């Protein structure tokens, strides 16, 4: 049976069905067509078990009559959504028109050329059908009509047209013979010769479910084997038109069918203590191309298909179980607050044949279980969850071994509670730090050191009309000098960390502390000097006199703490005194046992004394840091960006570049000459010195790097900070912007010129606009944070006026400044004392503040598709160690990369409602392997392979559109690899 579909218009679907059987005269049997209108609850354009039928849909058939010549009246789908048209004739084109009810519309759906496994597409009618027709056409996916609810849609605004024509071909003529009757033979008639083909094969008991005869497997006797037509699952006929009888396997598991006609068939296997997996295999007979049979085949047919061996699976008493629960705190594991969810469907599939073993549902406590299999047997377990729910981390598809005592549980949450309009892409405000002069308990003790800025801020906080945009969270007496800042979205707590700056005192807990700001209460979350010993971060006591610069200056960037970030209920902060990252728990009292210390070794500076780290961030679950070779001991001025491998406990370089590129002017002196910003080796002099202070990633995966001018924290009146971008290449390395461009992005400073008219920046350009017209070529960034989907927010100076401390909003894809807000202005006359630092790195780092959310993750898998069916079957292993690239939208460069784990899984954090591609170069796989079929089973998108081969770039590619809600999603990014033959 062959079914052909074609889609002509989005609102008009044309369906043509052709069923061909070769013979002599046209088949005249009358047909009935059965379909179903249903509410597509999960909007996957497929009818899934449990989705409700949709009644009262108007259906008309105006262009034809039934086989008696009667017109079909307008009718409506029944309460369960079904509709039946009786009395259809073959070779007639029928045009069905469906009219939508109010508040619903017809979904555009993909037609498939098959019925569900083991279900016939066409069958003879029976008396219980109460139909005039001889045959009933039903069950094909294409006859299920999906509707979607959308309030406001008017009735009749969505019209669906389905056109169908059926032709069953020819049948044998039935007229009586014209010759006289044949006289009875005097001896038994000679059987007709075998002119068809033989089909022979073996059955074996597959103990480990891998589809291969090995290990403890045995050949299986006394099992009934039937040959069926592949398409409609009816009994196969031989070349003489006779039904081919079932055969029982012999002691060696062998079976053989004789005289089989050309066609495509499958096997039906039934035996005591064995599962019947439905009609399995695809056995294609074409006698013209098949080999001749030989005596050892033991058959009489002239040609033979040696079908190989097929698996049989034993029944047993073992099973599996677990829970489905409402993950209230979005933490991905079952806790005391979480409650079980009843009614979640769990499906269990056997290996090799993708056969549904059984379906169970969770009870009132959220518990589910099944039994009936042998211990140690592999199965695939799928959770079918409501469309308005999402997983908080557990896989919807799982591959387990029967009999294990481990529960397989899944946490779920309504999508509406994942924080659709929350998260770092939707900040409400920003927190930054301000440096204050003098002792923390001196005359400026009440000056602000930590402030929160509203996302809508603009203007000048020091001017009354814009003051309401800024809120003071802490003062100098509370924290002293702090640079690092982090935010915990779970409870709204903010954290700031000590920083060493000349002329600005440490707070009451000294040089190595993290302070917590919680609902107006300021406490010391951890003092590392108490945990690990005095001067752990490098100690220093300020003099605040003529000795300050000479004694405090040399320790800038070498003592105290650097950048700090929050990730997964932990704080990550750099210890500048020891070139290490400290990982601090938030919900426990930090101590020497639970604070992790990660040393960051010199990656390549010619002298280890020249290696200085500062930034830290987490992107796609991976830890990054970086630093500079300072040149003090002769190493070349350069930058390293490093990624941590927790397995080897080591860092690898993902970006390296030197700092000798042309730079513009700090300012013009009184003679109009350029005061150079070219980076110099670290010293205690008033010269530009690169201190890599921040690394972050934008939504497109670009690496944003902020540099403080170290001299601004020592004595320089005007610092010259920098803001750079780098893009990820397909080799897994990042590449620094050049000429104001990064990959396919074109920045704001492609044609920029310095105050003296010269080109400057890496490759003579800068991606970000960093200048103050007529005053400075560099004004930021001391720190930076993601401020929205395509927004970067930075700290610097002089947005409106000279000697301001300012923050700026940037477009991350164009590098253009969008707006600014100034927090303070410092007196510049030299006579009026001021607590702030003007252009001398007066602000610290910055972080966004946002409502708690569950980020969105796309989970994929790379697996070995042993049987080549395009489906992730139980027993098929994942492929580990494969690098997968994520590409955002129409970018020409990757957004991120990751490596598949021991089970072949990988995941990417993605933005809402965005288009992405997952890409793997073909060269990453064994030569001779290939990609399996794509979208093999549209009804199970979570188990398909999604990839195709792009011959232009010789890569395997998948594509998907991310959801509009948080959670974990499992379709659109899987790769099935067929092994080398």
Curated annotation (Swiss-Prot):
It comes from the Eukaryota. Keywords: Glycoprotein, Secreted, Signal. GO terms for cellular component: extracellular matrix; extracellular region. Pfam families: SdrD_B. The keyword Transmembrane helix does not apply. Residues 1-23 form the signal peptide. Residues 177-194 have a biased composition (Pro residues). The keyword Glycoprotein applies. PANTHER family: COLOSSIN-B-RELATED (PTHR36108), COLOSSIN-C (PTHR36108:SF17). This is Colossin-C.
